[in-house]
Amino acid sequence: MSENSPDLYRETNVFERGNWLVKGDKVKADVPKLFSPIQKDGAKNRMDLALWLTNKKHPLTARTMVNRLWEQIFGNGIVETLEDFGTQGVSPTHKELLDWLAWQFMNDDNWSIKKMIKTIVMSATYRQQSTVNDELLKKDPYNKFYARGPRVRLSAEQVRDQALCISGLISDKMYGPGVMPFQPKGIWNSPYSGEQWKQSNGEDQYRRGVYIYWKRTAAYPSMTTFDGTSREVCTARRIRTNTPLQALVTLNDSAYIEMARYFAYRLQKEASINVDAQIRKGYELATGHVIDNRDLAILSGLYKNALEKFNRDKDKACEMIGVNDEHNNPETAAMVVVCNAILNLDEVVTKL
């Protein structure tokens, strides 16, 4: 991509009252006058703007960027108000740290986001345990001074993508038009449009959340429940909420039941026929650490209770698996219940 030569630049005018037929004063590309000017004579282009933004004499760009990276990792930025970095926003909790990270980002890291993330996640601050005791809770109730590691619920896209990955369903396909995974009928019903949600076929319905087709007036429901934005307006900062509806989505949404089902198929294929071995494997895949005896006993008990119910009522197993599915049996249906519980664990939907 390159800029047009100066002789190809077009004239730009202010449209009086927004009417493109009534041209007002001529305008030229430049930055707002309240900022320091771009030090260049003549016409200014995108390269000039990029160089101006990354000028080390005013590290606002670097400070804003590292603050957003910090928020993604720790749950809150050093300046909590990501959307307002000025005098009307909240003051930084660690001014010197913010300055040092910005300097590191501009100089040693040469604006590399990957290097900056590595610096943060390899720090002793990030690598702390997120468990809290009464003493720490009293001294630092909101963890503003990082008395413990971060504990942050995953974003809407991350919750879905992680469940797809754990179940083995996720598609690595990249690019292309938006996809339409399963969602309840009637979401798109509107009096002014005959458009319908047409569920994608094959691997397209298991692609990452960033590829989901988004209609501003009828957003993908499970995403909005987990604070995904409607995109009707620009959102500079997402506020995380915790509501009972979120648990109802991951427990009962048809898409998440399907993920739990394929998770169970994966465990039966990759682990031994021993149920406890399958549960151990599933827990480790989902959480990244080995299950303890207490949690194993709880999940084993859940499996036994579900198996008893499905043995008494085979139709319930059919509802869980599907009548024409080769895995249609009480044992697999019971494992689906366990897998659904694992995908809903706090350790899975929360970054600890």
Which residue ranges define each predicted feature?
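Primarily short, surface-exposed interaction patches in extracytoplasmic proteins
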Residues: 1-201, 232-238, 251-319, 329-330, ...
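A structural supersecondary motif
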Residues: 213-216, 224-234
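Short, surface-exposed polybasic-aromatic patches that bind anionic ligands, especially phosphate groups
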Residues: 338
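Short, low-complexity, Pro/Ser/Thr/Gly-rich segments in the mature regions of secreted, periplasmic
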Residues: 341-351
